[in-house]
Amino acid sequence: MQIYIVGGAVRDELLGRPNADCDYVVVGATPETMLAQGFRPVGKDFPVFLHPNTHDEYALARTERKTGHGYHGFIFHAAADVTLEEDLARRDLTINAMAKAADGTLVDPFNGQQDLASKTLRHVGPAFAEDPVRILRIARFAARFSDFSVAPETLALMRSMVACGEVDHLVAERVWQELAKGLMEQKPSRMFEVLRDCGALARLLPEVDKLFGVPQRADYHPEIDTGIHTMMVIDQSARRTFTLPVRFAALTHDLGKAETPADILPRHIGHEERSVRLTEQLCARLRVPNDCRDLALLTARYHGNIHRAADLKASTIVTLFEKTDALRRPERFRQLLDACLCDFTGRLGWENRPYDSPQYLLGALAAVASLNAGEIAVACADKTKIPERIHAARVHAIKQLLDNPGEQPEQQ
């Protein structure tokens, strides 16, 4: 039997990029051969084995055949007579369809090295059209390799897949999985650019697609277009290496602007409430994890208040802290401020503009956190008024801070 390193590890080595994961393909072996050599089977749908010492995954060379719609509509054939080229032919992109032998020989039957040099994302063959997840994967690779372009024939094939309804059969969990990975790439806006270009964005994330072409006030948004603004915001979240919940909140914070009545454009009065509703809808459909959903909803609802923090009354700031559970969840509140920072700087010419709201609100939060709510409760004779007394004490603490800014408590 012959063992080859395949896929991303080969690609990244040629690009000079780090890659901690190695995928191995074994040609000329059977499951019995692997077991006899001490490998442990782990694959459910096709033969994958763990190396007895390194615990790396080794997959038998296999082919696949389409049997139905969507991601799960395949049957696999793995046998000793499946060749390396047959295994590589089922892969999505030419740059991922290369292998390296034990002696270092590069196996490149689909000219992946040439496409790396020309910075082209090109599908391997017609089997690409059988798996709609590959549309999402190409878009994700565009976000990772942001200076690569999609080959014209590949883009045409992606458009035909969308037109025939293949993407409509994608399961929610797989869409979210690829979306999350794309948001964590170097330039996530490229993912949405490619999805929009092939028509998949309108089918998978219509709430985001509808933002493009919606105008905003030029004095606050020199980039004008809400869709372009959203792309700038998610790229800001990537540039600052923020967490996935922050990046997802950056994507969804302005969804409500797509439903602003035409007669009040380019103003967007009440878009925060509309954004909350649309974000809830999107999160339910894609089964978004709770941490991402919750931060996205808070950002959609409160980003306007946070931008105006210096103009808010002390009582409004306290209400903001209470509504966002900032005292019990300070780390999440910081993430909320991170998302708002991306929104503020994700505007044409505003990328490096100072943004004072986070420091201002964290100072106010520290002042409120320094209060002893238990002591206030004990001192309150009428127990029904405890929440009211605590709220009033918090308002007073912030008023004192505003009157004496030099005496700001230390932030935790």
From Swiss-Prot:
Q: Which Pfam families match?
A: HD, PolyA_pol, PolyA_pol_RNAbd
Which co-factors does it depend on? Mg(2+); Ni(2+)
**Where does the chain bind Mg(2+)?**
21, 23
Residue stretches making up the HD domain: 226-327
InterPro entries attached here? CCA_bact, HD_domain, NT_sf, PolA_pol_head_dom, PolyA_RNA-bd, tRNA_CCA-adding_enzyme
* Additional notes on this entry: A single active site specifically recognizes both ATP and CTP and is responsible for their addition.
Keyword tRNA processing in annotation: yes
PANTHER family linked: MULTIFUNCTIONAL CCA PROTEIN (PTHR47545:SF1)
Supply the alphabetized keyword list.
ATP-binding, Hydrolase, Magnesium, Metal-binding, Multifunctional enzyme, Nickel, Nucleotide-binding, Nucleotidyltransferase, RNA repair, RNA-binding, Transferase, tRNA processing
Q: Which reaction does it catalyse?
A: a tRNA precursor + 2 CTP + ATP = a tRNA with a 3' CCA end + 3 diphosphate; a tRNA with a 3' CCA end + 2 CTP + ATP = a tRNA with a 3' CCACCA end + 3 diphosphate
UniProt comment concerning the protein's domains: Comprises two domains: an N-terminal domain containing the nucleotidyltransferase activity and a C-terminal HD domain associated with both phosphodiesterase and phosphatase activities.
Family matches, as CDD domains:
NT_ClassII-CCAase (cd05398)
Q: Does the keyword Metal-binding apply?
A: yes
The entry marks the following residues as binding ATP, namely: 8, 11, 91, 137, 140
One GO term under biological process is: RNA repair
Assigned protein family: Belongs to the tRNA nucleotidyltransferase/poly(A) polymerase family. Bacterial CCA-adding enzyme type 1 subfamily.
> What does the subunit comment say?
Monomer. Can also form homodimers and oligomers.
| Role played | Catalyzes the addition and repair of the essential 3'-terminal CCA sequence in tRNAs without using a nucleic acid template. Adds these three nucleotides in the order of C, C, and A to the tRNA nucleotide-73, using CTP and ATP as substrates and producing inorganic pyrophosphate. tRNA 3'-terminal CCA addition is required both for tRNA processing and repair. Also involved in tRNA surveillance by mediating tandem CCA addition to generate a CCACCA at the 3' terminus of unstable tRNAs. While stable tRNAs receive only 3'-terminal CCA, unstable tRNAs are marked with CCACCA and rapidly degraded.
Tell me the protein's name: Multifunctional CCA protein
Task: Give the cofactor note.
Answer: Magnesium is required for nucleotidyltransferase activity. Nickel for phosphatase activity.
